[in-house]
């Protein structure tokens, strides 16, 4: 019995139409044979049997699939000693040692680094100015050119840019801000030399590219002497150091001028410090209080400055846990480590603070401050009364 009689009839009509058409060849396309489909109805018994077979197959699959823990144990047993990786504890210790070594290198690097402030931004723009700057800090003496200190690297910081671009892109494109004409630099020398202090003293306050340089050491910066310095307030945020050099230059020789700036925007905060070489210059500088200052920047208006003495706030000198005062070498390591190390490492630093060339003593580990109650004096009034009371109680 044919299940699809209509499909066969339609196929015959289509074949006759294509035979008469001119587009196709005379050969007719063969007819597709239609397979017979037999529909078998399953009884309830057959359905129950199929369900049982599926349940049995699923049970077999559950039994055959091993757990992840068993697979992991088998893999461990089959691994040869060559395939077993190294212990993670050793790798962590090696990582800690490498971090310590890099941080110690940074502390050692700071001892041969000097800071140069109020530097003209022409050093970044002009190659000839950069070469002159490099030559200035290479030579120890102006008379003897053979005495040189080799420079390892020069880094420029506090550079203000005009556009909001990435700093590297703006630096390459030389898009510097017009109102900020000075930058800071860090010069790293290849070797640590005692002649660096001589170089710092000679170049501090020297004029380079129409600006007074401020040269100082990183590890042992020059102390801020409150008696030889004055506080200057009511400054414009865009004020420059050269304006203060010119304004206070008549009072006496100036050691350095420092305008306090915002670390992110490099704009001034409205106040500065001027330190003189002589104490008598401070009294002359105080006479300039409430007097207007002519700015080097032409677009800035005259402002009346507030000139006062610096407050003499005493700072407690750092000491070790043994109570002893630290040496210059220990202060160097502690001062730089505060910026390089994190909070946990800084807390351990005083325990492990060692400097090469210093011999350890027996009393280094003994703390001066003892915990608990204070010991009673043996010859005091309280002890005498207590001893007399005990004797009177024994007689009774």
Swiss-Prot record:
GO biological process: maturation of LSU-rRNA from tricistronic rRNA transcript (SSU-rRNA, 5.8S rRNA, LSU-rRNA)
Biased segments, Acidic residues type: 47-58
Domain RRM: 112-220, 228-312
Swiss-Prot/TrEMBL keywords: Nucleus, Repeat, Ribosome biogenesis, RNA-binding, rRNA processing
Record region (Disordered): 43-104, 361-396
Keyword GTP-binding: no
PROSITE patterns on file: RRM
Top-rank lineage group of the source organism: Eukaryota
UniProt biased composition (Basic and acidic residues): 87-104
Xref: InterPro entries: Nop12_RRM1, Nucleotide-bd_a/b_plait_sf, RBD_domain_sf, RRM2_Nop12p-like, RRM_dom
Similarity comment: Belongs to the RRM RBM34 family.
Protein name: Nucleolar protein 12
Species: Candida glabrata (strain ATCC 2001 / BCRC 20586 / JCM 3761 / NBRC 0622 / NRRL Y-65 / CBS 138) (Yeast)
């Amino acid at each position: 019995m044919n299940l699809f009689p209509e499909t066969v009839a339609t196929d015959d009509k289509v074949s006759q139409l294509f035979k008469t058409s001119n587009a196709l060849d005379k050969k007719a396309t063969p007819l597709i044979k239609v397979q017979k489909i037999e529909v078998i109805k399953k009884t309830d018994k057959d359905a129950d049997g199929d369900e049982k077979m599926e349940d049995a197959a699923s049970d077999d699959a559950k039994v055959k699939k091993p757990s992840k823990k068993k697979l992991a144990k088998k893999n461990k047993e089959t691994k040869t000693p060559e395939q077993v990786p190294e212990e993670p504890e050793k790798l962590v210790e090696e990582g800690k040692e490498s971090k310590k070594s890099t941080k110690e290198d940074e502390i050692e690097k700071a001892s041969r680094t000097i800071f140069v402030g109020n530097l003209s931004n022409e050093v970044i723009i002009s190659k000839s100015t950069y070469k002159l700057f490099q030559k200035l800090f290479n030579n120890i003496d102006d008379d003897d050119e053979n005495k040189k200190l080799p420079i390892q690297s020069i880094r420029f910081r506090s550079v203000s840019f005009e556009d909001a671009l990435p700093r590297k892109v703006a630096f390459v494109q030389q898009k510097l801000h017009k109102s900020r004409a000075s930058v800071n630099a860090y010069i790293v020398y290849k070797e640590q030399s005692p002649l660096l202090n001589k170089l710092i003293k000679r170049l501090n306050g020297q004029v380079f590219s129409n600006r007074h340089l401020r040269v100082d050491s990183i590890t042992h910066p020059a102390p801020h002497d409150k008696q030889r310095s004055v506080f200057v307030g009511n400054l414009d945020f865009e004020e420059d150091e050269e304006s203060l050099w010119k304004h206070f230059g008549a009072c006496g020789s100036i050691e350095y001028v420092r305008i306090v700036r915002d670390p992110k925007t490099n704009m001034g905060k409205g106040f500065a410090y001027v330190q003189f070489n002589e104490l008598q210059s401070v009294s002359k500088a105080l006479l300039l209080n409430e007097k207007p200052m002519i700015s080097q920047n032409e677009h800035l208006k005259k402002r009346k400055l507030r000139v006062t003495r610096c407050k003499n706030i005493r700072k407690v000198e750092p000491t070790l846990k043994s109570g002893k005062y630290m040496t210059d070498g220990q202060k160097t390591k502690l001062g730089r480590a505060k910026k390089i190390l994190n909070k946990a490492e800084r807390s351990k630093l005083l325990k492990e603070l060692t400097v090469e060339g210093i011999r350890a003593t027996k009393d280094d580990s003994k703390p001066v401050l003892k915990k608990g109650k204070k010991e009673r004096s043996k010859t005091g009034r309280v002890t005498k009364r207590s001893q007399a009371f005990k004797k009177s109680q024994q007689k009774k």
